[in-house]
Amino acid sequence: MRSDMIKKGDHQAPARSLLHATGALKSPTDMNKPFVAICNSYIDIVPGHVHLRELADIAKEAIREAGAIPFEFNTIGVDDGIAMGHIGMRYSLPSREIIADAAETVINAHWFDGVFYIPNCDKITPGMILAAMRTNVPAIFCSGGPMKAGLSAHGKALTLSSMFEAVGAFKEGSISKEEFLDMEQNACPTCGSCAGMFTANSMNCLMEVLGLALPYNGTALAVSDQRREMIRQAAFKLVENIKNDLKPRDIVTREAIDDAFALDMAMGGSTNTVLHTLAIANEAGIDYDLERINAIAKRTPYLSKIAPSSSYSMHDVHEAGGVPAIINELMKKDGTLHPDRITVTGKTLRENNEGKEIKNFDVIHPLDAPYDAQGGLSILFGNIAPKGAVIKVGGVDPSIKTFTGKAICFNSHDEAVEAIDNRTVRAGHVVVIRYEGPKGGPGMPEMLAPTSSIVGRGLGKDVALITDGRFSGATRGIAVGHISPEAASGGPIALIEDGDEITIDLTNRTLNVNQPEDVLARRRESLTPFKAKVKTGYLARYTALVTSANTGGVMQVPENLI
């Protein structure tokens, strides 16, 4: 066993003495059993994580029943909804790297035989997956689960995106103070990840198709008995996989990454999944070309439109058959998925999901009646984004295939929000928000406030927004993010000026500023070099090492320093 490194031999008597002091070893034979880490992310200020202490206790009990010894440790977590709209958002994406580094440190320092990961919200899930790829120790994931959807006094279904859009609607005067307060009190009624197809739930669903989690991981409610039983079953399966030496890199292959993007397309997932899945591929040693994503989009139908793109919540999807029903439907179209690859269950993706039929065709559409013949995400290329940009086409009004407008440029999120709120931004504008990428932000902050304000003011079909920052999974409208290279790295988005005509072509997947190359070249000559906004602490180190979004926004040590 891997853990023999810390518990076998006379020279490890001091280590064994310390292990006895933990109280985790209940009998003389326990030292001969596998040591299993429980990588938890319990934290009081994140509603998606307040219940994870209870889930970890269930996992510990089940791991002991299965014949192994559990040891729990915790990682940090950032709630994107609470960190939104201020400098706290600078820490959200960078927290992913801290989580990965922290888990790697504990797992490798103590030579665990396996790891039970309990994530739930936005950056915690991908951070833990990065750690699993990096350490490549037998592992299983079981998330905390989504919260129930809220319900307003008027019987309207609510999610967190409803609340962000309500801010713009209230400022516009289209809802009353009483309606506003009612929504605030009822949008998030239970613990769990936010109820729509936002980043947290997108990633938790993707773990099913990647093969790292059990079926229904992405949709079973946080407060359900099914979630607690899933924790138990995952614990038993992990101990079995330790014995069989089934490792994360055996499961997460190039084909698994393809299938993750296919599910994302079918469910209209968050644009952040592109960023995180590219980072996962990088950590797994898989060279993954962005162009593959468009090829996957072309062959994958859009089957389930979930909040913020509709009123359906994750619970509605669960009741309609969950991710297994969507996977089963996609498997009926040859060439869409790679169903014969191994998963954490020890069975193939096909064996896990075959025969799981759709129970509600309003929530999950069949292959012969999709929302769209092509997937809900697109990668755009052009002279603004030579290395790519991302748009959630599933969140754009279906009548819009191209949008051309006049640029109105801002060098920060806050400047843009102020201009939208004071009505400087008008119909026909393309809002350009730059110097908000991984280096520029720093931390690639989410642009939910400006996009929600645009939609809340009734301009969702008349104003576009492009940025080298990113979006919340709750974002909808004509919103293009992850523009690469970012402005802070000298990307062409830095060259756009007010009044430039910009065309977003969803059909041809292009993003261009309609200016001659010689004009852009002259502008580049006078471009002021970017200076880091943060000079000390973690964000200063992050700024120095982080890459643009097209490579997943990962931290890389320059080759000349290795």
UniProtKB/Swiss-Prot annotation:
Protein name (record): Dihydroxy-acid dehydratase
Enzyme Commission numbers on file: 4.2.1.9
Residues bound to Mg(2+): D80, D122, K123, E446
UniProtKB keywords: 2Fe-2S, Amino-acid biosynthesis, Branched-chain amino acid biosynthesis, Iron, Iron-sulfur, Lyase, Magnesium, Metal-binding
Role: Functions in the biosynthesis of branched-chain amino acids. Catalyzes the dehydration of (2R,3R)-2,3-dihydroxy-3-methylpentanoate (2,3-dihydroxy-3-methylvalerate) into 2-oxo-3-methylpentanoate (2-oxo-3-methylvalerate) and of (2R)-2,3-dihydroxy-3-methylbutanoate (2,3-dihydroxyisovalerate) into 2-oxo-3-methylbutanoate (2-oxoisovalerate), the penultimate precursor to L-isoleucine and L-valine, respectively.
GO terms under biological process: isoleucine biosynthetic process; L-valine biosynthetic process
Annotated Gene Ontology cellular component terms: cytosol
Cofactor(s) in the UniProt record: [2Fe-2S] cluster; Mg(2+)
Amino acids binding [2Fe-2S] cluster: C121, C194
Designated gene of the protein: ilvD
Family named by the database record: Belongs to the IlvD/Edd family.
Organism: Staphylococcus aureus (strain NCTC 8325 / PS 47)
Gene3D superfamilies in UniProt: IlvD/EDD C-terminal domain-like
Pathway named in the protein's UniProt entry: Amino-acid biosynthesis; L-isoleucine biosynthesis; L-isoleucine from 2-oxobutanoate: step 3/4; Amino-acid biosynthesis; L-valine biosynthesis; L-valine from pyruvate: step 3/4
Modified residues (N6-carboxylysine): K123
Reactions the enzyme catalyzes: (2R)-2,3-dihydroxy-3-methylbutanoate = 3-methyl-2-oxobutanoate + H2O; (2R,3R)-2,3-dihydroxy-3-methylpentanoate = (S)-3-methyl-2-oxopentanoate + H2O
Quaternary state and interactors: Homodimer.
Keyword Lyase: yes
Molecular function terms, GO-annotated: 2 iron, 2 sulfur cluster binding; dihydroxy-acid dehydratase activity; hydro-lyase activity; magnesium ion binding
Root EC class: lyase
Keyword Transmembrane: no
Annotated cofactor note: Binds 1 [2Fe-2S] cluster per subunit. This cluster acts as a Lewis acid cofactor.
